[in-house]
Swiss-Prot record:
<keyword id="KW-0547">Nucleotide-binding</keyword>
<dbReference type="Pfam" id="PF22919">
    <property type="entry name" value="ATP-synt_VA_C"/>
</dbReference>
<keyword id="KW-0139">CF(1)</keyword>
<comment type="subunit">
    <text>F-type ATPases have 2 components, CF(1) - the catalytic core - and CF(0) - the membrane proton channel. CF(1) has five subunits: alpha(3), beta(3), gamma(1), delta(1), epsilon(1). CF(0) has three main subunits: a(1), b(2) and c(9-12). The alpha and beta chains form an alternating ring which encloses part of the gamma chain. CF(1) is attached to CF(0) by a central stalk formed by the gamma and epsilon chains, while a peripheral stalk is formed by the delta and b chains.</text>
</comment>
<dbReference type="InterPro" id="IPR000194">
    <property type="entry name" value="ATPase_F1/V1/A1_a/bsu_nucl-bd"/>
</dbReference>
<dbReference type="InterPro" id="IPR050053">
    <property type="entry name" value="ATPase_alpha/beta_chains"/>
</dbReference>
<dbReference type="GO" id="GO:0005886">
    <property type="term" value="C:plasma membrane"/>
</dbReference>
<dbReference type="InterPro" id="IPR055190">
    <property type="entry name" value="ATP-synt_VA_C"/>
</dbReference>
<keyword id="KW-0472">Membrane</keyword>
<comment type="function">
    <text>Produces ATP from ADP in the presence of a proton gradient across the membrane. The catalytic sites are hosted primarily by the beta subunits.</text>
</comment>
<keyword id="KW-0813">Transport</keyword>
<dbReference type="GO" id="GO:0046933">
    <property type="term" value="F:proton-transporting ATP synthase activity, rotational mechanism"/>
</dbReference>
<keyword id="KW-0067">ATP-binding</keyword>
<keyword id="KW-0406">Ion transport</keyword>
<dbReference type="Pfam" id="PF00006">
    <property type="entry name" value="ATP-synt_ab"/>
</dbReference>
<dbReference type="Pfam" id="PF02874">
    <property type="entry name" value="ATP-synt_ab_N"/>
</dbReference>
<dbReference type="InterPro" id="IPR027417">
    <property type="entry name" value="P-loop_NTPase"/>
</dbReference>
Length: 459
């Protein structure tokens, strides 16, 4: 246990000088001897016994000359069943005022990804109960899913609905990592889980947006380490990360202070490597699976921004939320033409599901092309076939909307869980023209097709 002293503090980056024969290793955790007891993580060795570190907490009250001790190991967090139902910070300390976490077992947050031989793939579908997702971009059990969207199009609400549906229907464990998001949403989420009686199956790790960049940079790894423990015990785990963009952003914040040259759009030059280190660990092994759902903020609605573009490469399914669809009042605002999934293959999901999904996409794409003609010449100039197609497209567009359980307090409408079988049957019926006689508003904000038929009787 060697000790050194602080020689420089710039924002969240702190330089510490140690005796030359006992310089701490990269990623070692250092403890500052101060009232706050701040933890530092070694990032670089500058030579002459000086190491450059990131603070895992506020640097207020720190000053040059304070004593720092090397713990001799990386940051470690509690793992196992004792973490369920608890809220923890980046260092695994409880922040829910419910006493210490009753486990002796701790794992380091920096771990190697499973080797090629240990990994296992799977094609089992994970039903979400959300029509548009199950139809157009189905999720794979043990896969990675990204929810892409700009500010205020509903990423967190979609995420909370997915957690509610999957955590209640799926009986396994879940880990939720709140990375740089609003504290209010973290609080709402905790109460949502408590009210749904699934809190005892969820471990919550928060590093919210008011916290220093060190916390936001590492909190995703803290959550992932807890999920890996459950997976290695033979469980199927759900890992929710909200928001992966803030993980990148925290890296950007400290990158320049660490002396790195910025790359495109000011991002850190190590963007792809940092993302890869995190994403490669989120994988299924022969012991158990990790199914990961990640919200990805898209700066200025630009999907070609380096951060979302780097994330795309790692995902099995992408759910793209569109501002244009949200402006029509259709929620969830998922863009069925932009969202994709590796599972959308007749050999995996079956021919009927595949044909229905592709049929829906064809009709919506054709409607998109005809919109310009309709805007200039009006509906009357279209052929009979195109008129029929436009009517069906408008019904499909409305039928893709759905009331959410987690939004009941805002909408006043009770949430709906729609099984995959009912989803396929409903859209297949609209494509075949079985419901051409129903008005299009009957399809808006309903669950299954039977509900749309009932609603039409009241209109």
């Amino acid at each position: 246990m060697s000790s050194g002293r602080i020689v420089q503090i710039i924002g969240a980056v702190i330089d510490v000088e140690f005796p030359r024969d006992s310089v701490p290793s990269i990623y070692n955790a250092l403890e500052v001897k101060s009232a706050a007891g701040t933890t530092l993580e070694v990032q670089q060795q500058l030579g002459d016994g000086v190491v450059r570190t990131i603070a895992m907490g506020s640097t207020e009250g720190l000053k040059r000359g304070l004593e720092v001790t090397d713990s001799g190991a990386a940051i470690s967090v509690p793992v196992g069943k004792a973490t369920l139902g608890r809220i923890m910070d980046v260092l695994g300390n409880p922040i829910d005022e419910a006493g210490p976490i009753a486990t002796e077992e701790r794992w380091g947050i920096h771990r190697p990804a499973p080797s090629f031989a240990e990994q296992a793939g799977g094609n089992d579908l994970l039903e979400t109960g959300i029509k548009v997702i199950d139809l157009v971009c189905p999720f794979a059990k043990g896969g990675k899913v990204g929810l892409f969207g700009g500010a205020g199009v509903g990423k967190t609400v979609n995420m909370m609905e997915l957690i509610r549906n999957i955590a209640i229907e799926h009986s396994g464990y879940s880990v939720f990592a709140g990375v740089g998001e609003r504290t209010r949403e973290g609080n709402d989420f905790y109460h949502e889980m408590k009210d749904s009686n699934v809190l005892d199956k969820v471990a919550l790790v928060y590093g919210q947006m008011n916290e220093p960049p060190g916390n936001r940079l590492r909190v995703a790894l803290t959550g992932l380490t807890m999920a890996e423990k459950f997976r290695d015990e033979g469980n199927d785990v759900l890992l929710f990360v909200d928001n992966i963009y803030r993980y990148t952003l925290a890296g950007t914040e400290v990158s320049a202070l660490l002396g790195r040259m910025p790359s495109a759009v000011g991002y850190q030059p190590t963007l792809a490597e940092e993302m890869g280190t995190l994403q490669e660990r989120i994988t299924s092994t022969k012991n158990g699976s990790i199914t990961s759902i990640q919200a990805v903020y898209v700066p200025a609605d630009d999907l070609t921004d380096p951060s979302p573009a780097t994330t795309f490469a790692h995902l099995d399914a992408t759910v793209v939320l569109s501002r244009d669809i949200a402006s029509l009042g259709i929620y969830p605002a998922v863009d069925p033409l932009d969202s994709t999934s590796r599972q959308l293959d007749p050999n995996v999901i079956g021919q009927e599901h595949y044909d229905t999904a592709r049929g829906v996409q064809y009709v919506l794409q054709r409607y998109k092309e005809l919109k310009d003609i309709i805007a200039i010449l009006g509906m009357d100039e279209l052929s009979e076939t195109d008129k029929q197609l436009v009517n069906r497209a408008r019904k499909i567009q409305r039928f893709l909307s759905q009331p959410f359980f987690v939004a009941e307090v805002f909408t006043g409408a009770s949430g709906k869980y729609v099984s995959l079988k009912d989803t396929i049957a409903g859209f297949k019926g609209i494509l075949n023209g079985d419901y051409d006689h129903l008005p299009e508003q009957a399809f808006y904000m309903v669950g299954g097709i039977e509900e749309a038929i009932e609603k039409a009787k009241k209109l």
